[in-house]
């Protein structure tokens, strides 16, 4: 665990009718401003680890890049909180394209997206992957066992990428979207294909989280928490299996149940 992501702090804890003084661990919160082609693009408030993965994953999720080799230069000044990105095809980047809200359509039905780039980058999932109910629960258990920073602080979200057998990468962050972007960035940097992968997640499956999963291209999203109705509507259209409330020996399948077998 990167020591920069948490700090020790003396606190006064009230329990069973009395105060005691103790040392607790608290997560760090770090603002990182991303400069693309000399222009301020976004400030990400994040946990200060795996920052290159975070920036690359975020840019890919937003449709700024598709592959890591579209970046000509990349530098991070952690002391000042800046990441500098120069694109190979700089003339194709227009920051104004990333602030336009849009309602797109698919197969004759209205599909709601937040921004124009969501229409371009969300992928419809493939059908060739399926897992057993036991695997569903085992993958969630593996994510929880790997989540040391959460166990120490209780202040982060956890995300993991799996194949049909095992969990092979995990990332944590104070922002649930950041944890997903770190995974996306890692996969781009290491050229890991995503179309046959499964996303395991600690937080609520909101519409934004579902869109992140669709942009990765995963077919199954597994969470220990609840989904939202808008997220489930999107999952239906994008052919994504959503599994929520994975706790102990039970869970709920909300969409495209055919991928989860007994």
UniProtKB/Swiss-Prot annotation:
Matches recorded under InterPro entries: Cytidine_deaminase-like (IPR016193), FdhD (IPR003786)
KW Cytoplasm (keyword) present: yes
Keyword Cytoplasm applies: yes
GO molecular function: sulfur carrier activity; sulfurtransferase activity
Disulfide pairings: none
Pfam families: FdhD-NarQ
Signal sequence coordinates: none
Gene Ontology terms: cellular component: cytoplasm
Domain of life the protein comes from: Bacteria
Record-annotated active site: 107 (cysteine persulfide intermediate)
GO biological process, one term: Mo-molybdopterin cofactor biosynthetic process
Locations listed in the record: Cytoplasm
Keyword terms of this UniProt record: Cytoplasm, Molybdenum cofactor biosynthesis
Protein's job: Required for formate dehydrogenase (FDH) activity. Acts as a sulfur carrier protein that transfers sulfur from IscS to the molybdenum cofactor prior to its insertion into FDH.
Entry-linked HAMAP family: FdhD
Family membership: Belongs to the FdhD family.
UniProt-recorded name of the protein: Sulfur carrier protein FdhD
């Amino acid at each position: 665990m990167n020591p920069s992501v948490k700090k020790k702090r003396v606190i006064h804890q009230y329990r069973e009718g009395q105060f005691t003084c103790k040392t607790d661990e608290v997560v760090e919160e770090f603002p990182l401003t991303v400069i693309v082609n000399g222009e301020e693009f976004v400030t990400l408030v994040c946990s200060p680890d795996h920052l290159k993965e975070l920036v690359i994953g975020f840019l890919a999720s937003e449709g700024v890049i598709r592959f890591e080799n579209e970046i000509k230069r990349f530098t991070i000044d952690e002391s000042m909180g800046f990441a500098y990105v120069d694109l190979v095809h700089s003339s194709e980047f227009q920051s104004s394209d990333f602030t336009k809200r849009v309602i797109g359509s698919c197969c004759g039905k209205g599909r709601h997206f937040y921004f124009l780039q969501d229409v371009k980058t969300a992928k419809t999932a493939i059908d060739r992957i399926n897992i057993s109910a036991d695997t569903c629960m085992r993958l969630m258990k593996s994510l929880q066992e790997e989540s040391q920073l959460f166990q120490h602080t209780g202040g982060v979200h956890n995300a993991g990428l799996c194949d049909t057998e095992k969990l092979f990468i995990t990332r944590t962050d104070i922002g649930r979207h950041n944890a997903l972007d770190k995974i996306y960035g890692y996969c781009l940097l290491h050229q890991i294909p995503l179309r046959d992968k499964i996303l395991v997640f600690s937080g609520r499956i909101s519409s934004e989280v579902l869109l992140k999963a669709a942009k990765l291209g995963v077919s199954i999203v597994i969470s220990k928490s609840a989904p939202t109705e808008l997220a489930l509507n999107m999952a239906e259209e994008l052919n994504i299996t959503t599994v929520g409330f994975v706790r102990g020996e039970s869970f709920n399948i909300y969409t495209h149940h055919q991928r989860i077998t007994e």
